[in-house]
């Protein structure tokens, strides 16, 4: 990919250009506006996860591929330290992906932290299933037009092919651990 320290917008711009796409064409294919892509690529705003997923789908990349180091170890790691988790979140939502460098993995696990008043943005949709448990605080899961209020100790299981979102409407932090299959991140 590109340099390790490169800002996300700059990396998105490089990827788009490597694929021979104009900003306007990337906007058409992703369903975003040209101005949104321009603003993101200039690193004036940090895109929501759902927005980033739309762009990466056009570029044929998963979130983990986008955020991973370009060089993968020959042997997948067995023990993954906290410092090795891949941060994929933005705008008050931290999503740390447990990734061992195995490109053929079929399961993804994410540690999610939602600051008060934050959300994943517009509804997310990707192939597969997701299960998760609220470890601390509370979260509102919206799926199929229905809001589900979950508190610490409660779990959820959803078909991620149905658009869904998570919102922390409380005054406290919410922490979730979730697993996804297949690995769309």
Curated annotation (Swiss-Prot):
Pathway: Amine and polyamine degradation; putrescine degradation [regulation]
Domain Cupin type-2: 111-178
Keyword rRNA-binding belongs to the record: no
One term of GO molecular function: DNA-binding transcription factor activity
Mutant lacking the gene: phenotype: Cells enhance strongly the transcription of puuE.
GO biological process: DNA-templated transcription; putrescine catabolic process; regulation of DNA-templated transcription
Region Disordered: start-end pairs: 1-20
Gene3D superfamilies (UniProt xref): Jelly Rolls, lambda repressor-like DNA-binding domains
Keyword Methyltransferase listed: no
Domain HTH cro/C1-type: 12-66
Pfam families per UniProt: Cupin_2, HTH_3
Alphabetical keyword list: DNA-binding, Transcription, Transcription regulation
DNA-binding region(s) from the entry: 23-42
Domain of life according to the entry: Bacteria
Role noted for this protein: Represses puuA, puuD and puuP.
UniProt cross-references to NCBIfam families, sorted A to Z: PRK09943.1
Protein name: HTH-type transcriptional regulator PuuR
Taxonomic source organism: Escherichia coli (strain K12)
Gene it is expressed from: puuR
């Amino acid at each position: 990919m590109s340099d390790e320290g490169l800002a996300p917008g700059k990396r998105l711009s490089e990827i788009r250009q490597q694929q021979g796409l104009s900003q306007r064409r990337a906007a058409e294919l992703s369903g975003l506006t040209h101005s949104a892509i321009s603003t993101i690529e200039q690193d004036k705003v940090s895109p929501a996860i759902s927005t980033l997923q739309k762009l990466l789908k056009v570029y044929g990349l998963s979130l983990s591929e986008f955020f991973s180091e370009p060089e993968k170890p020959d042997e997948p790691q067995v023990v993954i330290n906290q410092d090795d988790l891949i941060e994929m979140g933005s705008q008050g939502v931290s999503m740390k992906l447990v990734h061992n460098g195995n490109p053929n993995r079929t399961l993804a696990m994410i540690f999610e932290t939602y600051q008060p008043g934050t959300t994943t943005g517009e509804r997310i949709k990707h192939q597969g299933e997701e299960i998760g448990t609220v470890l601390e605080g509370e979260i509102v899961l919206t799926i199929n037009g229905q809001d589900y209020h979950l508190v610490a100790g409660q779990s959820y299981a959803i078909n991620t092919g149905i658009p869904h979102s998570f919102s922390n409407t409380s005054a406290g932090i919410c922490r979730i651990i979730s697993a996804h299959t297949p690995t769309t991140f």
